Curated annotation (Swiss-Prot):
Protein name: Protein RecA
UniProt cross-references to Pfam families, sorted A to Z: RecA, RecA_C
GO CC annotations, alphabetized: cytosol
GO MF term list: ATP binding; ATP hydrolysis activity; ATP-dependent DNA damage sensor activity; damaged DNA binding; single-stranded DNA binding
Record function comment: Can catalyze the hydrolysis of ATP in the presence of single-stranded DNA, the ATP-dependent uptake of single-stranded DNA by duplex DNA, and the ATP-dependent hybridization of homologous single-stranded DNAs. It interacts with LexA causing its activation and leading to its autocatalytic cleavage.
Chain residues that bind ATP: 66-73
Superkingdom of the organism of origin: Bacteria
Family recorded in the similarity comment: Belongs to the RecA family.
Compartment(s): Cytoplasm
Principal cellular location given in the protein's record: cytoplasm
Keywords: ATP-binding, Cytoplasm, DNA damage, DNA recombination, DNA repair, DNA-binding, Nucleotide-binding, SOS response
Organism annotation: Nitrosospira multiformis (strain ATCC 25196 / NCIMB 11849 / C 71)
Coiled coil: none
Amino acid sequence: MDENRSKALAAALSQIEKQFGKGSIMRLGASDVGKDVQVISTGSLGLDIALGVGGLPRGRIVEIYGPESSGKTTLTLQVIAEMQRMGGTAAFIDAEHALDSQYAQKLGVNVQDLLISQPDNGEQALEIADMLVRSGSIDVVVVDSVAALTPRAEIEGEMGEPQMGLHARLMSQALRKLTGNIKRSNTMVIFINQIRMKIGVMFGSPETTTGGNALKFYASVRLDIRRTGSIKKGEEVIGSETRVKVVKNKVAPPFRQAEFDILYGEGISREGEIIELGVQHKLIDKSGAWYAYKGDKIGQGKDNVREYLKEHRDIAMEIESKIRAAVGVSNPAEPAPVE
């Protein structure tokens, strides 16, 4: 670039920074753009690895969708619990009016510090989300769910009255407004979404998510969560086998999958994942029903090993660190010290 053009560019950059603030424009190579993505653990080791960066990215929009009772709310509550352990603050916008505080507490959520809002309509819910994001003091905002964000006009109208495209228009407008504020405040906003069936689809999947197409475009990460089976202890069902597919990922390669167990009343079984991934990466030796670590037997059967790792947290953490090192995914930030 010749000298005159360089001077003109420098003057323009200076004017932009003066008018819009420092950092409003920067050179990609000389900045931290795209480097060292700050993440929050999902509470699932396998999913952290599948996401490629060790968790869900901060300053981004995340969509988690799936059929009913597939573990969508459980996964988001685990993210909130992980954020709180790191000393962060979270807010839960409960548009479905269905959050169970006792269940959240069992998953490790500090319900005393969790901010909760149960809005009357979709506009109110998204306005509250925007105000929380703009405050810059919230780390995670969860909206549960997109399907329950009923536009005010629909609530005030007659039952059965056609309201074409109101929901999609509401989401599109809100996301245009939210996206810049989310990046500036480094807040992660998680939208939980439901599945609907498209009518008359001959080829391909008839499934679609609610709220139009805007969220699909604005989301940096989209997770498809499904229940694949039941976990039994004798005849009693104690949990569900779950598979999550990373359908979209702007911070790492997409289309990876993770499988884990969700135990009723406990949430994601971290110890179960450590066992499976430990065996996979040859850190834990499996011979018949027996499991051994560093030559020492740690239990017979997966349930007994899971209990052993719960009692010996230091060994569980050691194996987890080795798994993360083996796959090249760093540990999330250590929890903030308690005052």
